[in-house]
């Protein structure tokens, strides 16, 4: 156990355009090498593309996509005796959002569209409809937890 105090959680300021804290946090996930202006351009560009294609509030679609990606349970490795078990555990809300954002950005980067804004828009729309690589990742994690349900008594 660390002997130092736990670092205080820093509040993320709301994003300037939509006034959403979760969107500001998402921009930080998109950001590479501290280039926040580039990340903002990518995210706002993606939301504009979503608005063009769906003719509805892009922030609602973004939140719907995050809900579709966020896992409810995951597995953690637990060593008992000489064996390592994959123990299913519930995911706390802050980690749910963090995982959802990470998966969304990772799978958007792997897509084939030309610009990152287009890739992100495509992944957002797919996730909001319950398809796409990020949603598949969530289903895989849930399937893994279901398969290892027998070890759930090895709680942390």
Swiss-Prot record:
Pfam families, sorted: Ribosomal_S7
SUPFAM superfamilies: Ribosomal protein S7 (SSF47973)
MF (Gene Ontology): rRNA binding; structural constituent of ribosome; tRNA binding
GO BP: translation
GO cellular component terms, A-Z: small ribosomal subunit
Keyword rRNA-binding applies: yes
Gene3D superfamilies xrefs: Ribosomal protein S7 domain (1.10.455.10)
Keywords assigned: Ribonucleoprotein, Ribosomal protein, RNA-binding, rRNA-binding, tRNA-binding
Subunit structure, as described in the record: Part of the 30S ribosomal subunit. Contacts proteins S9 and S11.
Cited function: One of the primary rRNA binding proteins, it binds directly to 16S rRNA where it nucleates assembly of the head domain of the 30S subunit. Is located at the subunit interface close to the decoding center, probably blocks exit of the E-site tRNA.
Family according to the record: Belongs to the universal ribosomal protein uS7 family.
Name by which UniProt lists this protein: Small ribosomal subunit protein uS7
Organism: Pseudomonas fluorescens (strain SBW25)
């Amino acid at each position: 156990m660390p002997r130092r105090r736990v670092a205080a959680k820093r509040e993320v300021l709301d994003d300037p355009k939509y006034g959403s804290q979760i969107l500001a946090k998402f921009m930080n996930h998109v950001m590479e090498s501290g280039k926040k202006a580039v990340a903002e351009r990518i995210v706002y560009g993606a939301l504009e593309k979503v608005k063009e294609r769906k003719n509805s509030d892009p922030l609602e679609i973004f939140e719907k996509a995050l809900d579709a990606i966020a896992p409810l349970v995951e597995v953690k490795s637990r060593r008992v005796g000489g064996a390592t078990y994959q123990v299913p555990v519930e995911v706390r809300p802050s980690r749910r959002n963090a995982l959802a954002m990470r998966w969304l950005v990772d799978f958007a980067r792997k897509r084939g569209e030309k610009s990152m804004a287009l890739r992100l828009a495509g992944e957002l729309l797919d996730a909001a409809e319950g398809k796409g690589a990020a949603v598949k990742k969530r289903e895989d994690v849930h399937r893994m937890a279901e398969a290892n349900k027998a070890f759930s008594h090895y709680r942390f």
